[in-house]
Curated annotation (Swiss-Prot):
HAMAP family: 2PGK
Cofactors that this protein relies on: a divalent metal cation
GO molecular function: ATP binding; kinase activity; phosphotransferase activity, carboxyl group as acceptor
Annotated EC: 2.7.2.16
Family, similarity comment: Belongs to the 2-phosphoglycerate kinase family.
Key words, A-Z: ATP-binding, Kinase, Nucleotide-binding, Transferase
Protein name in the entry: 2-phosphoglycerate kinase
Catalytic activity, as annotated: (2R)-2-phosphoglycerate + ATP = (2R)-2,3-bisphosphoglycerate + ADP + H(+)
Location of the ATP-cone domain: 5-92
Involved pathway(s): Thermoadapter biosynthesis; cyclic 2,3-diphosphoglycerate biosynthesis; cyclic 2,3-diphosphoglycerate from 2-phospho-D-glycerate: step 1/2
Biological source species: Methanocaldococcus jannaschii (strain ATCC 43067 / DSM 2661 / JAL-1 / JCM 10045 / NBRC 100440)
Function recorded in the entry: Catalyzes the phosphorylation of 2-phosphoglycerate to 2,3-diphosphoglycerate. Involved in the biosynthesis of cyclic 2,3-bisphosphoglycerate, a thermoprotectant.
Length: 309
């Protein structure tokens, strides 16, 4: 790559060309409208060119962006930008996006990942497929059903069979989910995990209490709107709309159950009507969690400015 005409950003173990797009994405995640974020990214670029800066340390770039935002009266955006850049650069964060089938966990997870620059998004359906490779049908038959049909293979029918089947199905998948969380925290890798198997009351408390783990539950309160999501999904994917509609009442039971368990565990519930609004609400929730993480470490804004990425 010919870097002679680029401004080079230098990290601790790498160098890369200054990217207005990456900076604009970071500013958007911090709360700026995309058009304003890109304009400020251009301003920063032009400022560096005017000063004839050819190589800039990443921490110095972060400091310049922070103070430029302050100078433009974007104080809250500046604080969020600083928080995100420091945390994502140095600390792992695991974001869990739960919700019943059809509420949009995949869409929201990928939107958040794009905003924050988190490269890894894992669906619990994928983890379920891995678990099926190592656990036989005879041992856990519910694992081989869908979340809303697991009740069919229960060996007893005490209580609400639909919810009990869902719980048995999810428990096996959560074993794999917890393994992924452990691995990411140990290796310092950020990840977003999304899916219907993320049941708050079935996940170990040590994960819910970990400041590096953020759990958000999505829902759609209106039944008709929820049902319309399946029709819309069927037009753009190969997923069988008829099957979802056949078990829609059970899916709604699971939706209500997941919202109830989230509230019981103090996990924020976000209704997913408009994607942009949902993403903004989720980012605000994640930001508040990260503030708690930083407070526990006793770091001030000045500390964050000085700490290299």
């Amino acid at each position: 790559m010919d870097l002679q005409n680029d401004i080079i950003v230098r990290g601790k173990s790498y160098e890369m060309p200054f990217s207005k797009g990456i900076l604009a994405r970071s500013l958007t995640a911090a709360g700026l409208k995309p058009s304003i974020a890109y304009r400020i990214a251009w301003d920063i670029y032009e400022m560096l060119k005017k000063e004839n800066i050819r190589v800039i340390d990443k921490a110095d770039l972060r400091r310049r962006v922070y103070y430029y935002l302050i100078s433009k009266n974007y104080d809250e955006v500046a604080k969020k930008y600083l928080l995100w850049r420091m945390v994502l650069g140095r600390r792992p964060i695991v974001i869990l996006i739960g919700g019943a089938s059809g509420v949009g966990t995949s869409t929201i997870a990928f939107e958040i990942a794009s905003r924050l620059g988190i490269p890894s998004v894992i669906g619990t359906d994928s983890i379920r497929e891995v678990m099926r490779k190592v656990i036989s049908r005879d041992l856990i038959p519910t694992l081989y059903e869908s979340s809303y049909t697991a009740w069919k293979v229960l060996r007893d029918d005490e209580g609400n069979k639909y919810i009990k089947g869902f719980e048995r199905h999810s428990e096996a998948v959560l074993t794999g989910v917890e393994g992924v969380i452990d691995r990411c925290l140990v290796e310092g890798q950020s990840v977003i995990i999304e899916g219907t198997h993320l049941v708050p009351t079935l996940l170990k408390d040590k994960y819910l209490e970990n400041s590096h783990v953020v759990f958000i539950m999505l829902t759609i309160y209106n039944e008709e709107l929820h049902k319309m999501r399946f029709y819309a999904r069927g037009r753009v994917s190969s997923r069988p709309t008829e099957r979802y509609l056949k078990y829609f009442k059970i899916i709604r039971m699971i939706n209500d159950y997941m919202v109830e368990t989230a509230k019981k565990k103090g996990i924020p519930v976000v209704e997913n009507i408009k994607i942009s609004e949902t993403v903004d609400k989720c980012l605000n929730i994640i930001t508040e969690r990260l503030k708690t993480m930083i407070e526990l470490e006793g770091l001030s804004e000045e500390d964050m400015l000085e700490e290299g990425l």
